[in-house]
From Swiss-Prot:
Homodimer. Belongs to the tRNA pseudouridine synthase TruA family. The gene is truA. This is tRNA pseudouridine synthase A. One of its GO terms (molecular function) is tRNA pseudouridine(38-40) synthase activity.
Length: 268
C-alpha cells in the first residue's frame, strides 16, 4: 500500500464543489470514479481544500492510498485519460504514509478576481466577477484590511451551515492588486471558514464603492456582526491557488505556474 499525492486543476463551473454528494456531480466523485476504472478498487481521496460549488482550483492537492502496480508518477497521465477535460492532473508523486493533503498543510492560498471594467468581456465571465457599476477604490479596500493579519475570530464571515467547531483561524497575508480593470485579492490562511473568502470580498467591494467605510468593515468582523454581512461575492471569481507544506511535494510544477492567468486584452 502506498500513498499518492495529486496536483489538480479544475473548472469549478461544471461541478457542485470538491466533496462527493448524492445528487450532484463533484470533483471528488470524478477522480474516485477514474481511480476505480484504473484499479477496480474503491479508493477514497482527501483534498487540501473543500471548494464550494462553482469555485475553481489551479493547484488543489489530493491524496489517496492504493495497492496497485502503476508507478506513482504515472497516475497523472493515466487519470487524465479517464477524466473530463474540465479536470486535469498536473503531477502525481508518492508521499510518506503519515503525510496528509489537508492536515499537513501549513496554509492555503485563495485568489478572487474582479473585473471592474464597464465593458463586458465574455472570456472573463467564467473566471471573474464582473462588478462594473462603480469604479472600485482599491486603496480604500486595502485600508479596510488593517488588523486582519493573525489569529482572529471571523465568525461574521462564516456562512450558515458550517461544520467547523470554531470560527477562529489565522490569516497569514491578504493583498489587493489592480492590473488595469482586474482587481486581484489574494488571501493566505491556515484554514478557511465556509464561505469566508466570498463574504470578505463582498464586504470589500462595498468599501471600494464607498457604500461603507473601512471602519464599518472592521467593526463588522471584529464585533462578529454576522447579521450585517449580507453581500457575498459569486463563486465564479474564486480560485483555490495552492496549499503549502513544510516540504516540497511536487517537483516538476513551479508554484508560479499555478496562478490563474489571463492573456487577453493585455492581461497576464
Amino acid at each position: 500500500m502506498k500513498r499518492v499525492a495529486l496536483l489538480v486543476q479544475y473548472d469549478g463551473s461544471y461541478f457542485s464543489g470538491w466533496q462527493r454528494q448524492k445528487n450532484a456531480i463533484s470533483v471528488q466523485e470524478m477522480i474516485e470514479d477514474a481511480l476505480f476504472k484504473v484499479s477496480n478498487q474503491m479508493i477514497k481521496t482527501f483534498a487540501a481544500g473543500r471548494t464550494d460549488s462553482g469555485v475553481h482550483a489551479s493547484g488543489q492537492v489530493v491524496h489517496f492510498d492504493i495497492d496497485f502496480v502503476i508507478p506513482s508518477d504515472r497516475y497523472a497521465n493515466v487519470l487524465n485519460s479517464r477524466l473530463p477535460s474540465t479536470i486535469r492532473i498536473l503531477e502525481s508523486v508518492e508521499v510518506k504514509k503519515n503525510w496528509h493533503a489537508c492536515y499537513s498543510a501549513v496554509y492555503r492560498h485563495y485568489r478572487y478576481v474582479i473585473n471592474n471594467s464597464k465593458i463586458p468581456n465574455l472570456f472573463l465571465n467564467k473566471w471573474s466577477w464582473h462588478r462594473y457599476q462603480k469604479s472600485l477604490d482599491e486603496f480604500l479596500m486595502s485600508k479596510a484590511l488593517n488588523g486582519m493579519i493573525g489569529e482572529h475570530d471571523f465568525y461574521a464571515f462564516q456562512k450558515s451551515g458550517s461544520t467547523r467547531s470554531t470560527s477562529v483561524t489565522t490569516i497569514k497575508s491578504i493583498e489587493i492588486e489592480r492590473t488595469e480593470d482586474l482587481i486581484l485579492i489574494d488571501i493566505k490562511a491556515t484554514g478557511f471558514l465556509y464561505g469566508m473568502v466570498r463574504s470578505i470580498v463582498g464586504q470589500l467591494v462595498l468599501v471600494g464603492e464607498k457604500k461603507i467605510s473601512p471602519e464599518i468593515f472592521k467593526d463588522r468582523w471584529v464585533g462578529k456582526k454576522k447579521q450585517d454581512v449580507h453581500e457575498s461575492a459569486p463563486a465564479n471569481g474564486l480560485c483555490f491557488v495552492n496549499s503549502v507544506y513544510q516540504e516540497t511535494i511536487f517537483k516538476r510544477i513551479d508554484k508560479n505556474d499555478l496562478f490563474p492567468k489571463f492573456v487577453i486584452r493585455g492581461y497576464s
